[in-house]
Curated annotation (Swiss-Prot):
The protein's name: CRAL-TRIO domain-containing protein C23B6.04c
Keywords: Cell membrane, Membrane, Phosphoprotein
GO cellular component, one term: plasma membrane
Organism in which the protein naturally occurs: Schizosaccharomyces pombe (strain 972 / ATCC 24843) (Fission yeast)
Comp. bias (Low complexity): 885-899
Amino acid sequence: MKDSEHHHHGHNGFSKFLHKLGFGKSKGKSHKSNTSSIHERENTAAKGPASNVRPARPNVSTSSTSNEVRKSVPVGNPTVHTKTGSSSSPASKMRNTVNLQHIQAANQKTRNAEGERKVAQRRVQSDKAEANDAAMSSSAPTVDVSEGNSAAEPKITPDDSDTPRLNVDMNDKINVDEAAAKSDSKLNVDQINSTTESEKRVEKVNPNIANNPLKSPDAVAYSSETVSDEKQPTEHPVSANVPAKSEKAVCDENTKISLTNTEHYKFHSLRGDVEVVVGDLERDGRDTSLGDASVNEAAKETDVDSSRFISDEKAVTEDAMKTEHASNAPLTDERHFQFHSSEGDIEGIVGTMQRQRQSVSSYDTIVPSQFYKQKVVQNSPPSLLSTDNKIPESGSDHPSSQDNSSKASLVENSQTQSSTPRKPLPTTTSPKVNPEPHSESISDTRPSTPRKVPPSTVPKMNPKLQGGNSVTAPSTPSKVLPAMSPKVAPKFQGGRSSTAPSTPNKVLPAASAKAAPKLQEKAASFDIPNKSTIISTKSTVASPIKANENSPALKSKASFEFPKELDPDGTWNAPIPYPDANCPMAPTYRNLTSEQEEMYEEVLKYCLELKEIPVASNSSKKTDLIELERLWLTRECILRYLRATKWHVSNAKKRIVDTLVWRRHFGVNNMDPDEIQEENATGKQVLLGYDKDGRPCLYLYPARQNTKTSPLQIRHLVFSLECAIDLMPPGVETLALLINFKSSSNRSNPSVGQGKEVLNILQTHYCERLGRALVINIPWAVWGFFKLISPFIDPITREKLKFNEPLDRYVPKDQLDSNFGGSLHFEYHHEKYWPQLVELCKSRRLGILEKWRKMGSKIGTSEWDLKGGEEYVELMQQYVRPSLTNRSSSPTVTPTVNTDRQPKTLTNSADELSPQKRRVENPKPVVKDEGPVSIVEDEESTPVVTKKEDSIPVAQSTKADAGLDAENDLLPKSGSGVSETPAFSHARDVSTASFSDAVSFITADSIE
């Protein structure tokens, strides 16, 4: 008992000792249990290895000090006693005290070493910063330190404190921060990471790097003198004597957009084209190459040809020639092309056909294959080198006929010019080059001598675009375009006449004659075209063509504007550019009442004051009207909305704005034909021919549906409507809808939501656009639907609907598809039809845009004037389509109405998908394979089957049975004229939408 008490008191004293040192806390355990456990461990350790009890570690706390002790304790347990005896003996206390002192000393030594290492690192960094400051600024004061301490390691003074102190002898007690402020040097690591006055000093030294996020000891703020002495790269080089550009003209580094390619950039820099190097960054909502905006703006402001504006001095440094630029933007529009082609800028015309899936001007596709292919094929995308744009050989002047030596000299000349400062040519008389044109090529009927005008007509450069530079126009000799094939001409001319009204040319100043020989050699090697041959100097609008059948301009125009896709078997594979020559055309809305004219003026005034509209229907952000949106607001457009709203002015204003917002949000002006061409791969929507009133005919074949229900189907329908509007002649505002429901299926109609969206688009945004709807082979479901809604349809709309009637009453036979009873044997081949439709619509659209610009870009311009008016009528009357007498061996059938069997259309629709199983009382005649079969036409153009010596008039011996013919006798195996090509068979099996678009279109017009 006494022994237990003795151990208890002894251990209690040791616990108090540990507690004073901050180690041994009992954590709620009794002293008795602690004393007994320690006593047992000490006795067990004294007995030796025979004991099964494992020796324990000393009881230490989990504080930070305990962790440090635990890390520095050597292997083993230093507190375990090896001799028996009381734990309260002086020897035991001494041993514990000595062990703790050793641990503290080791920990202190470790901290001191770590502190020395950090101080040494700071000193090295400080020395580096001082060395950099001394190198950058020789006059900057330096920090003096005691000798020997600059390179030696810092000394640590012994101290009881845990934090070591750096003993640095500073001469005259100069503060480090003050020395750094005087020397404008970089601060140390601790000071640079905090927002102090040092950052303000950096801003004063060099404002260009004030916002530099780089904060490191090596990031030294250069002085303004040092920055100015260094040679900075020229991002947008101009002539050496040109004054500095304004801040607006200089492109920011983060948003800079380069010219189209390196050769393009070098060419303009070589010639000193200020407005090409300097320009706005954005136009029409997208990034463009520098300089395009300035050219267009100058042309708009002066309303004359946008010729080159070049500074008086043309010296360009060699460093500017070597500047490389990435190509991110295509040539933008026709104005840009007109600017470059007017003076023979081949590199200026060179561009990319499509970058980032953006449609660009058609002129970018022709020049690269003609000239640029020889030079930078490795830098051009594959689309530039397509075989469709190749130009056939036409004499020795054509680039394709040049030999390898001429090509080598071409590259050599271009390299020499791109590395040598040049000055423009002196004013010279253009050489008269009159190559013999191709039989179907573009011919220039005007004299090639340049015309001069007084200097007062030369436009002044916009100061914003030229950056404060005064510029004048130089002279360049005119040259003649070589002969070109008809296939290239449509893309090159965009559907406009090759002749243009004469416009005076600018007076060009003389320049140094040193550069003349080389530049002439390069121009000769390029065979640069004459600007008068390519395009009008003032506008691209075609001049009226005289009614002369032998006019070379008319022949050339017909050779490149209109497609010729007549196969040897008589099949037509292209859209038709003009309606029938006897089609009457006249301006609309000329006989308005005074009240209607007042309503129109009120809405027109509202549109003129309309500056900005929302970007979307559910958005509060507004932007200004773009050029195409203002072009859309024609006189006829405003009157259409007044008619659709029953001449209610407020409703017309609201609907016009709603349509503008929808067109912007839907992207009508930016629709890419490549995006939706898959939807029309089977020809389910075809624009072909015109009716007797000049309306373009839009054919719908629901059975040719080839895609699943998706928003892309709606975009395809909108694209077809826009193309139909482009093809409308002047004075025509509506289209004719022709629907053939043969072999269609209503198994899986589109969703109700999509049907509502289509209906809303047609009745809200394409009001007053349906002129006539002609439907054949109508199934019972559609027939019943229209019978059901017939009492609710507007009487005017009801008159537009024609079911199962002979369509030649409304459409000329030579413009009506043979599937609908016409004599035009049309078979849809996507690879032939689609590119020609896109090109024809693009040329019409560009022609309208150019006429609108020429007329002043005003809202409320008449569509009759924009689409050509009398000029269009004259061309329509002179246009003759290729002969269609070469027909296929199958007879064409003219459907007629059998009123006695009319109800059968409502009961026999179940057999629409299997025409072989039909039973019709009056089938068509079957022609046996006993001899050759051909088609002849009598005086009334009635198709007749001729076999050996017998001939049977088809139209007299058969009837169409209201569209339900026995076409099992006219399947493809027997040579039917009905288009049933294998390309459509696979698509009809996955039909997903039968007649949604047709029904929606007719219903939308009736709702209005």
